[in-house]
Amino acid sequence: MASIRELHQQLIKKERSAVEITTEALDRIEKLEPLLHSFLHITADQALESAKKVDAKIAAKEEIGLLEGIPVGIKDNMCTQGIPTTCGSKILENFVPPYESTVTQKLKDSGAITLGKTNLDEFAMGSSTESSGYQVTANPWDLSRVPGGSSGGSAAAVASEECVVALGSDTGGSIRQPASYCGVVGLKPTYGLVSRFGLVAYASSLDQIGPFARTVEDAAILLGAIAGYDPKDSTSLNVEIPDYTQFLKPKLSKLKIGIIKETFGEGLDPVVADTVNQGVEQLKKLGAKVKEISCPRFRYGLPAYYIIAPSEASANLARYDAVKYGIRKEADTLMSMYTTTRASGFGAEVKRRIMLGTYALSAGYYDAYYLKAQKVRTLIKQDFEQAFEEVDVLVCPTAPTTAFKAGEKTDDPLSMYLSDLMTIPVNLGGLPGMSIPCGFDRLGLPIGMQLISNVLREDLLFQVAYAYEQATDWHKRKPPLPQ
């Protein structure tokens, strides 16, 4: 499937209609879903109706925006009015939101065509999309492997060309890690740049919505459409949103890039290390000045995250009590209704994190765990602040390995958690981070390179990512799927 700008040109030149583009995407979904299981809900009728409206505008010689008529996928933890929003959980299997999230409303207003809701780890808690209460999504590059998580459905849908772009959410790497595993571009914006209103909360101080795309330009276009201040979100930043495509330049002269020393240590697959180092060499050729940077507290990100995030989750998920929405298991007393419903509605990983968080917040352990984790978070932020006094952009691997086999880590939570080792500190710092394809391993599995910039410096990420993309062809490779 073509890029956003290419499809836009085809539409305005009347080479193709929006209905034709939408039908092509829906046909591809129908063909690939038995293999991939990327989507939980497909909204074919609404998509075709929206496409007809775009075609009517074109027929009336009205101008159309860049996203009008462009097929998109939405992670199923963003509320969509009249369309099921399950968060990949059985506890919300019958939930149809009465309102629209800010980001999906912005996409509607931009004329984008929503094809459906994509699969995810239950309540976005996971790194493989295997904890979904409904289905396991496959990696388009190797159907026996995971697409990453928690936004695995969106990553797989974009990589397999079921849709042009998609939205995901990122709490500890849930956009960037699956982007790496699936060989696409994935961006976690600065915390507060994109409204969280209507995003079902996992860890409110860490969650952020962002784009998946096959090209850097498409990611820039999609971010421009969803970013911006929202009075409905108290953490929303009131800043001017630029046209991010203006930063897409092919050279990197005078740009200073830092390689995070601590990310090239124990646990990193040597092939991933070599591939990312080759990516760094390419950045040098493009004119960037590269130096090694130390972020000594980076390695404490994982344990701090797995106290802070579950603590916030234990509070956020207390609302699922079977009273106003979601499934309800009948019982003799109110308390037993709560416990029976939650016991049957939540999956194992969600229960594990609720228990972890409740323990960390309990009276006897609050200072020893939660408060200490927040202090570590502050130290990690200080590491980043010091690094950005010396360089413009930081570079490291997105994930320690390529995609692992389905079922390989389901019985070993710690091993699963380690796949977010490189991405978690970025969320703790509230910084923007982007994964871009930078090569493949011997099995033909994609490898991602992570770019990190200071708060609200997405412009630098787009500049570096675009220059690298234009000098390489990794983003042009396609997974071995039926065409």
Curated annotation (Swiss-Prot):
One GO CC term on file: glutamyl-tRNA(Gln) amidotransferase complex
Similarity section: Belongs to the amidase family. GatA subfamily.
Transmembrane helix recorded as keyword: no
PANTHER family to which the protein is assigned, alphabetical: GLUTAMYL-TRNA(GLN) AMIDOTRANSFERASE SUBUNIT A (PTHR11895:SF151), TRANSAMIDASE (PTHR11895)
Catalytic activity: L-glutamyl-tRNA(Gln) + L-glutamine + ATP + H2O = L-glutaminyl-tRNA(Gln) + L-glutamate + ADP + phosphate + H(+)
Covalent S-S links between cysteines: none
Domain of life of the native organism: Bacteria
Enzyme class: ligase
Name of protein: Glutamyl-tRNA(Gln) amidotransferase subunit A
EC number per UniProt: 6.3.5.7
